[in-house]
Amino acid sequence: MWTRLFLIIALAAAIPPGALAQDPAAEAFNAAMERMMADMHMAPTGDADRDFATMMIPHHQGAIDMARVELEHGDDPALRALAAEIIEAQEKEIAVLKAWLEKNP
């Protein structure tokens, strides 16, 4: 699953913003990628655990946002099922990361 997720993100990152601006799905994917990249742009603190938890939250949220675009615009049943699985898994992992950050200020 991780390999697929990273492949989706890498492919989406290769598309220049606005390149497919006429297509609603492309616009939604571009917006999701731009949000994720902006939210992930932060200077590391030197605390690997905190940096990992902090940076993974927007990364996972980006995956959720892209999966929601697939559910809204995609047709392939296998990809739609994968998108639903990604949303469920990533939401759980975000909750774990947020809980860790709260316990480790």
Predicted regions located by residue number:
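His/Met- and acidic-residue-enriched segments that coordinate or traffic transition-metal cofactors
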Residues: W2-A10, P17-P105
